Amino acid sequence: MKRRNILFILSALILLIVGGLTWGSFYMLNYSLRPDKNKETKEESLAYMFREYPYIKPWIDSLQEVGALRDTNIYSPANNVKLHAYYIKASRPTTHTAVIVHGYTDNAIRIMQIGYMYNHDLGFNILLPDLQYHGQSEGNAIQMGWQVS
């Protein structure tokens, strides 16, 4: 009888641990793929960039003034989600284009300082995409590289 109770308690404990780990895994996966804080507005992102990198304000203002900061949208063929990007042509014609991709929970505006270097200093065309569920792109979760087209 005593052995049977020990087996029952151990089985229940193992089941509880496995259930807790499974629940925790799904919770963390949902938390990491759908964070609430990554949806800054364009104005909030620009304010941050002008505060942290004041040298890009005249550049961005001049791009907006001449219409060189172009919003581009495409629809992903994989899941028909609208994806947003900024495209900035170089001041002189060139075949060089830099695709500059932001990191986890960031957006295209918050990497403009790198775009400045490629466009202003090196003379490249630049494409700054907002990945799915970031910035102005749509989607219901962050993609981690799989099924991204």
Regions found by a protein language model. Name each.
Residues 1-57:
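N-terminal membrane-anchoring alpha-helices
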Residues 3-4, 87-88, 112-113, 140:
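Short amphipathic alpha-helical segments
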Residues 95-103:
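Short beta-strand element of the alpha/beta-hydrolase
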Residues 105, 132-149:
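Catalytic nucleophile-loop/oxyanion-hole region of alpha/beta-hydrolase
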Residues 118-138:
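Conserved alpha/beta-hydrolase
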